[in-house]
From Swiss-Prot:
Residue positions of the active site: 64
EC number assigned by the record: 5.4.2.12
Top EC class, one word: isomerase
Matching Gene3D superfamilies: Alkaline Phosphatase, subunit A (3.40.720.10), BPG-independent phosphoglycerate mutase, domain B (3.40.1450.10)
InterPro entries for this protein: Alkaline_phosphatase_core_sf, BPG-indep_PGM_N, Metalloenzyme, PGAM_B_sf, Pgm_bpd_ind
Assembly information from the UniProt record: Monomer.
Any one of the GO BP annotations: glucose catabolic process
Recorded family membership: Belongs to the BPG-independent phosphoglycerate mutase family.
Lineage, uppermost ranks: Bacteria, Pseudomonadati, Pseudomonadota, Gammaproteobacteria, Enterobacterales
Chain positions recorded as Mn(2+) 1 binding sites: 403, 407, 463
Gene name of the encoded protein: gpmI
Organism: Salmonella typhimurium (strain LT2 / SGSC1412 / ATCC 700720)
Alphabetical list of HAMAP family matching this protein: GpmI
Protein name as it appears in the record: 2,3-bisphosphoglycerate-independent phosphoglycerate mutase
Highest taxon in the source lineage: Bacteria
Function: Catalyzes the interconversion of 2-phosphoglycerate and 3-phosphoglycerate.
Amino acid sequence: MSVSKKPMVLVILDGYGYREEQQDNAILNAKTPVMDALWAKRPHTLIDASGLEVGLPDRQMGNSEVGHVNLGAGRIVYQDLTRLDVEIKERTFFANPVLTNAVDQAKNAGKAVHIMGLLSAGGVHSHEDHIMAMVELAAERGAEKIYLHAFLDGRDTPPRSAEASLKKFEDKFAALGKGRVASIVGRYYAMDRDNRWDRVEKAYDLMTLAQGEFQADTAVAGLQAAYARDENDEFVKATVIRAEGQADAAMEDGDTLIFMNFRADRAREITRAFVNADFDGFARKKVVNLNFVMLTEYAADIKTAVAYPPASLANTFGEWMAKNDKTQLRISETEKYAHVTFFFNGGVEEPFAGEERILINSPKVATYDLQPEMSSAELTEKLVAAIESGKYDTIICNYPNGDMVGHTGVMEAAIKAVEALDNCIEQVTKAVESVGGQLLITADHGNAEQMRDPATGQAHTAHTNLPVPLIYVGEKNVKAVEGGKLSDIAPTMLSLMGMEIPQEMTGKPLFIVE
């Protein structure tokens, strides 16, 4: 008979943040003798679950998807926007080999560097700060002919807000003494995603042929003329920017073209028009042999250089368990099942070898304030049985209540949800201790600890950017480390299990065995 395993259990209390003020705090207003006792008597610490510490922009509230990716990855997983912000701030962007090679190639051949993208501070498809950094990179590396083809936003920004952005770039080029804005066009044309090729063709001709419906001496003048025609930013018609005596910025063979959008869906069509030999969306009047760079991978089947390929997450916690022949269980209700499986595994859908999954159906109610305990009793019953079975080396469980009931904004219901969880934690703790296992209790982000918005007085239904608790229950004598974050959890579990931590995990163990 096989030896019974003593499992390492991770319980994620979704939306269970830490806030010391009792006002509007469902967690502190609930009766939680079990969690209170654990916090008082067991090794514990607070960890960050929002902002830069989980790869989001500074001070942005955490969310369940990002939280579970970080929990399972054992490293901060940056979103593209934040990844680029960090790269630019730390100046690694300016040494990106794909970008520098593309610029150097054009410069050394006396060719132009064309930069295109959505000139916007919206941060959804692109960010103008990234485009500015690209202009600086090209200038610093000695490129003389730098042409910016600006797609105008007005969807993720106010409808008429492009003027300040265009002026900023015209001032920049003036200060550099080289380069210019060569064209402007609304995203309606340049960033279609529904195969409306007649629109894309107008943007393509504007850039390749330097031909448009309109022409202006400066980008700001071109924009003002569009406003006079009653075109908002998004719908600005193809406008060539060229003052008297300026060389035309049509694209030529051997030029470099760098597309600075980081979001793929609206970047694919125009990229295919430039890159695909067998392109048939429209008959191209001019096919240019360009050195084309995508900022991120817009599609796996677009064969051209990528400055920032997708970060594949090697050796996440789940994969590392499988490589070490360990058994693991993932268990949650419907609402958070994807989070303890797909997201915790770094975006991998298929279970790893030795990974089992249990899905408990969430109750069929209109809103969860009507049943704040949700399916926690059944979930706990199955979880306790799994702990006592001796089958699993590790178990990952998510209780959705704090988040799903927190989102309703109903304080009384959120209090009931937290009280139901306390009862569950009591049973789980007893089960873990009875088999000599170890338990970590934490959260992926806050929610239930702030049920009213102090600024508006309205119900607060969103997540928070507050820290979350981390508690250790087990037989080991451990000391807690301060200053942790979600990406420290996987290394913490491995260290408590006495396992090696893979080098890809840059997080640090938060409980040190004394």
